């Protein structure tokens, strides 16, 4: 969201995931925080829920934005698939990307580099996350076998902005 704001975008829609998974909550809170830190008013009407987190939801939400003339200049999607759907809708409606509406995804799936225009996204190191999660599982299993308390550990893993043509 910071990247979109640095590009001059101020009316940023958010295609968020379902209300419960923590990653969906965290990305929504990050969206809110970036708006607040940049003194951009939060508009609940610019937040759309993607229950399935797929391209058709991104397409449908983007079409709704265009039909209702919501004056959006960017979209931040919870994952790459809804962002891909938004791009498809914008292209079919002859909206220029990123000049009129920029689109940003999250996850850096292969499709993000294959579509036209290519999708700017946030890369998260999935293999490293998987290895850390497995190590936590092993540590907790060992602690339980030894009848020791399980110690809560917090890991922060860096993500990387991948800037492509959609922003």
PLM regions: where:
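Bacterial carbohydrate/catabolite-sensing allosteric modules
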Residues: 1-167
């Amino acid at each position: 969201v910071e990247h979109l704001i640095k590009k001059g975008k101020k009316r940023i829609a958010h295609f968020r995931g379902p209300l419960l998974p923590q990653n969906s909550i965290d990305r929504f809170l990050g969206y809110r925080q970036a708006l607040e830190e940049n003194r951009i008013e939060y508009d609940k009407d610019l937040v759309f829920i993607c229950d399935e987190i797929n391209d058709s939801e991104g397409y449908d939400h983007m079409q709704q934005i265009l039909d209702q003339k919501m004056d959006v200049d960017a979209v931040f999607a919870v994952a790459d698939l809804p962002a891909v759907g938004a791009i498809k809708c914008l292209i079919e409606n002859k909206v220029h990307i990123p000049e009129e509406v920029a689109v940003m995804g999250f996850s850096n799936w292969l499709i993000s580099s294959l579509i036209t225009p290519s999708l700017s996204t946030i890369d998260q190191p999935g293999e490293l996350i998987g290895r850390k999660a497995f190590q936590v599982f092993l540590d907790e299993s060992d602690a339980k076998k030894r009848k020791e308390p399980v110690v809560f550990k917090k890991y922060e893993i860096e993500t990387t902005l991948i800037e492509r043509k959609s922003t």
